[in-house]
């Protein structure tokens, strides 16, 4: 059973746009920067190399509070480098404040992905293998830390399911759009949108309830710690019990009644289910 899905670009609009204040320190041949860049340590080495200085020659400070980010402000780092160079040229501190139009026009967006995904399935609904063919549209060029959208989730491509066999093909496509980057759990939505759509397709093909299909494929509670096919270590859990708690809390019977009434009135009313596992660290 297979399906092809397209996950579109999407982004966030934090209340506070990007801000950088940079000062060249001529005696030190270093730089002092204050910005609302999200996670300055993560790309500190990249910025230092771009400026052709040792890491200890670039001091990068961030305020304790920032008006939102959701990953988008990771893309402030190119402007940090540019403002450092502008400060060196001007011989004075330089401040850059991104306005809303700039942000909406050119800020980072989540990576668009085209995925073809297939499952080898027994007649009883046990999934034996998965095959992913993923193509990420990353804009005009790869900008650090891309293609991390692929690899943050790579170890967990089988989700919460006990699937022993996995084949993966990843490709990057460049276009004439702005570069992509980190947005809200980057890599996770792209993977699970495809995987959970496939689970629903399998359920339809075998005439099995979507919840029951997932229950048949969850990693058993006595199998933890469980090493997934692509390497993720799932340390603990009871996915079946958790799913049953969610079903009970959702009152599916009442949802079905609402669905029937809505459809009788000519309205669309869907009931969705998804099971995901997110890495605890990036």
Task: Go through each PLM region and give its residues.
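Structural alpha/beta core scaffold segments of enzyme domains
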Residues: 1-282
